[in-house]
Design a protein with these regions (language model features):
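Charged catalytic cores and adjacent phosphate/nucleic-acid-binding surfaces used
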Residues: 1-153
Length: 153
């Protein structure tokens, strides 16, 4: 609690987490069409089949119940930095991920700290470009919904 309040020299120095779009229930899901529904939130029925048999996503639910347009974190709180786990990146199978981890110790090092050249030296330019694009937010994400994780498009 002291770190959350920035008391007695304690503080949060970084705040990393999964991009919400990758979550299993981020967007509303049409049970009839069997797919997540993109578009202006909140979604209360499927625009394709007009069904109201939907599983409402977290993003859409927040739009319905929010009481403010924006929120503000305390000035001492670091920003929330979205990350995309290696397992979500196309072209990175278990062997490639193991190779990266054996060379660089932790996924956090790979996702946030290493240079493109360091990554490229171990797994090649194509994979290094994917990791760096994900780090910089230069990837398109197909939102998850209805119990299915989102994915890089």
């Amino acid at each position: 609690v002291k770190a959350l309040k920035n008391e007695e020299g304690r503080k949060i120095i970084a705040n990393y987490g999964l991009d919400p779009k990758l979550g299993k229930y981020h967007r509303t899901f049409c049970e009839k069409c069997g797919k997540p529904i993109e578009g202006q939130a909140p979604i209360t029925h499927c625009p394709d089949c007009d069904s109201s048999n939907i599983t409402m996503g977290v993003f859409d639910r927040i739009e319905i119940i929010k009481d403010k347009e924006t929120t503000k974190s305390p000035s001492f709180r670091p920003p929330y930095i979205y990350q995309i786990p290696l397992t979500f990146m196309p072209g990175l199978g278990n062997k490639t991920i193991d190779k990266l981890l054996n060379n660089f110790d932790t996924e956090m090092n790979i996702l946030h700290k290493l240079s493109k050249d360091d990554i490229e030296a171990v797994v090649g330019e194509k994979i290094a470009n994917i990791v760096i694009a994900a780090r910089e937010g230069n990837v398109k994400i197909q939102s998850g919904g209805g119990g299915v994780y989102g994915k890089l498009a």
